[in-house]
Regions:
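Positively charged, low-complexity terminal tracts
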Residues: 118-120
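Beta-rich catalytic cores
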Residues: 31
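Short, charged, amphipathic alpha-helix that recurs within catalytic cores of restriction-modification
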Residues: 52-78
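Nucleic-acid nuclease catalytic cores
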Residues: 68-94
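Acidic-basic catalytic patches of nuclease active cores, encompassing PD-(D/E)XK
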Residues: 1-26, 40
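Structural signal for conserved beta-strand scaffold positions within catalytic alpha/beta enzyme cores
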Residues: 23, 48, 75-77
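Conserved catalytic cores of phosphodiester-cleaving nucleases, focusing on short active-site segments
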Residues: 35-37, 42-53
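Long, intrinsically disordered low-complexity tandem-repeat segments
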Residues: 98-115
Length: 120
């Protein structure tokens, strides 16, 4: 995890106390998302963290993971614009690669993203 993504992880952990997070540091299974989350409804989900100014960069392995695991997988992007955070469902990974941050997100801002993940 890069330094900006590490800082992003700390921010997310601090501001989502109702989600139990496990940071995944896996070098053997390429493309595995950064985080495993668990909410009060006993639902597991994965989150790939990205910090992006314009284009979001994904490895082929990351794309493959979300294509193979489209349910309860998410990409959370920290952006420099006013909303700050954008949450995308993993099943839209190909659209996200093609359209970048112009793609409509399923959550905009910390509160909307947090509520989406807490209510799965």
């Amino acid at each position: 995890m890069s330094r900006p993504e590490s800082n992003f992880w700390q921010y997310l952990k601090k501001n989502t106390p109702n989600i139990s997070w496990t940071r995944i540091e896996n070098t053997s299974a390429l493309g595995t998302p950064d985080l495993l989350g668990y909410n009060k409804y006993k639902v597991f989900f994965t989150v790939e963290l990205k910090v992006a100014k314009r284009n979001i960069k994904f490895s082929p392995h990351q794309i493959s993971f979300h294509v193979k695991h489209p349910v309860n997988s998410f990409i959370l992007v920290k952006t420099p614009d006013a909303c700050g955070l954008k949450l995308y469902e993993g099943l839209r990974i190909r659209e996200l690669v093609a359209c970048g941050l112009e793609l409509d997100a399923c959550g905009l801002g910390l509160d909307a993203c947090r509520l989406k993940l807490e209510s799965l």
